[in-house]
């Protein structure tokens, strides 16, 4: 019984924190003049490998548009990866992950990405890779209460991406 009370209290505190954070996110969502296009705030993270030798900068934001005639929403997540490597990663696919960390449901094969490079040495360059993933309205709205976790698969590595409950709540408070 004590564990259930502690878990209930923790869930309530997390929900209250998510509400506060979602209000901040909602204020940062950009809306077009005609109210048909939306851009969420950019979130940036630094991912490090076990030995922290080659940190990766991961940035993302949601972008949505509403059709004029039937009010259907189209959503995509824009992703920007910056890293130092011998070759570009070449992201190929994104899998949806469940709450237990299993990432077995293919969301989308990733098409073309934009890759730029700079500061090359004999062995490595600084790469910036930009790509997008289409996400269904149902998938995003179903994820508001638990967040959305994805696995991004490249030729070299697999990375995780987490869209928080607060981000999705704030974004969809505006995108209606």
Model segments located where?
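A generic "folded-domain core" signal
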Residues: 1-145, 151-176
């Amino acid at each position: 019984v004590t564990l259930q009370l502690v878990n209930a209290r923790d869930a309530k505190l997390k929900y209250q924190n998510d509400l506060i954070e979602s209000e901040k996110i909602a204020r940062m969502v950009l809306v077009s003049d005609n109210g048909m296009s939306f851009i969420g705030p950019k979130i940036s993270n630094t991912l490090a490998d076990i030995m922290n030798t080659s940190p990766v900068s991961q940035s993302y934001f949601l972008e949505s548009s509403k059709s004029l005639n039937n009010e259907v929403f189209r959503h995509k997540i824009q992703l920007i990866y910056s890293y130092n490597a011998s070759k570009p990663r070449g992201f190929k696919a994104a899998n949806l992950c469940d709450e237990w960390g299993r990432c077995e449901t293919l969301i989308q094969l990733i098409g073309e990405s934009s890759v730029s490079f700079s500061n090359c040495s004999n062995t490595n360059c600084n790469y910036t890779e930009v790509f997008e993933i289409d996400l269904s309205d149902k998938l995003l709205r179903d994820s508001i209460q638990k967040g959305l976790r994805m696995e991004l698969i490249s030729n070299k590595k697999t990375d995780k991406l987490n869209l928080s409950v607060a981000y999705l709540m704030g974004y969809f408070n505006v995108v209606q």
